[in-house]
Structure formats: structure tokens, C-alpha cells
């Protein structure tokens, strides 16, 4: 009877240790996933900021082109 308690205790201890390792591995994987996602978010944020600058430049150029066209139309009407 004493031996079966020792074996049972060893099985329980081994299970607890294996479960702890599994949890640490999962935690490490999740931590790495979060870091990867944060890096991707930072990159996307930088991309969005660059695109915003390009959009503003395109709007400014379109406004200048429209102004030139308006000036040409006015000169033909005279």
C-alpha cells in the first residue's frame, strides 16, 4: 500500500511538472506572438503615416492643377 502511494505521488508530481512546462511554453509562444503583432502594428502605423503624406501631396497637386485650369478657362472667356 505504501508503494502505491509513492507511485501515485510520483505520477501526480510528474503531471504537475509537465503541465507547468506546457504552460510556460504556451506563455512564451503567446509572448512571442504579441511581440510580433506589436512590430507589425508599428510597421503598419508607419506605412499609414507615409501614405497620409502622399495623399496630402496628391491633393495639393490636384488643387494646383485645378487652379491652372480655372485660370486657362478665364483667359479664354475674355
UniProtKB/Swiss-Prot annotation:
Main location: membrane
Sequence repeats: 24-34, 38-48
Record's keyword annotation contains Signal: yes
Single annotated GO MF: peptidoglycan binding
Keywords for the protein's UniProt record, in alphabetical order: Cell outer membrane, Cell wall, Coiled coil, Lipoprotein, Membrane, Palmitate, Peptidoglycan-anchor, Repeat, Secreted, Signal
Lipid attachment points (S-diacylglycerol cysteine): 21
Subcellular location: Cell outer membrane; Secreted, Cell wall
Topology term for the membrane: Lipid-anchor; Peptidoglycan-anchor
The organism's place on the tree of life at top rank: Bacteria
Family: Belongs to the Lpp family.
The name this protein goes by in its record: Major outer membrane lipoprotein Lpp
Organism: Morganella morganii (Proteus morganii)
The organism's taxonomic lineage, starting at the top: Bacteria, Pseudomonadati, Pseudomonadota, Gammaproteobacteria, Enterobacterales
Amino acid at each position: 500500500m505504501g508503494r502505491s502511494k509513492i507511485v501515485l505521488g510520483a505520477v501526480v508530481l510528474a503531471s504537475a511538472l509537465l503541465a507547468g512546462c506546457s504552460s510556460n511554453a504556451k506563455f512564451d509562444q503567446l509572448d512571442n506572438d504579441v511581440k510580433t503583432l506589436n512590430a507589425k502594428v508599428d510597421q503598419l502605423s508607419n506605412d499609414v503615416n507615409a501614405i497620409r503624406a502622399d495623399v496630402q501631396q496628391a491633393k495639393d497637386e490636384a488643387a494646383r492643377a485645378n487652379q491652372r485650369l480655372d485660370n486657362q478657362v478665364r483667359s479664354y472667356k475674355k
